[in-house]
Amino acid sequence: MKKKIHPAYSQIIATCSCGNIIEIFSTVNVNLNLDICAKCHPFYTGKQRIIDTGGRVERFKKRFKLIKKDTV
């Protein structure tokens, strides 16, 4: 590697809104504030919420059937 052409690589602190502190290395010399991390993300914690759109789909199909019957 050529000398004096690469950016400075330093240790920074990334702080999550849940309070988790992560020390990482980066060329950006500014500490980061994160909205979500692996400790509080629903995918990693296993506390996923499944959104049930079945009721909406069924209601749409029901409306579509009524319109189709009226026009025929």
From Swiss-Prot:
Protein keywords: Metal-binding, Ribonucleoprotein, Ribosomal protein, RNA-binding, rRNA-binding, Zinc
Residues annotated as binding Zn(2+): C16, C18, C37, C40
Keyword Repeat assigned: no
GO cellular component term of the entry, any: ribosome
Pfam families given in the database record: Ribosomal_L31 (PF01197)
Cofactor(s) the record lists: Zn(2+)
Cofactor note: Binds 1 zinc ion per subunit.
Keyword Phosphoprotein attached: no
GO MF annotations in UniProt: metal ion binding; rRNA binding; structural constituent of ribosome
GO BP terms, alphabetized: translation
Record InterPro entries: Ribosomal_bL28/bL31-like_sf, Ribosomal_bL31, Ribosomal_bL31_A, Ribosomal_bL31_sf
Subunit record text: Part of the 50S ribosomal subunit.
Its job: Binds the 23S rRNA.
Entry's family note: Belongs to the bacterial ribosomal protein bL31 family. Type A subfamily.
Protein's recorded name: Large ribosomal subunit protein bL31
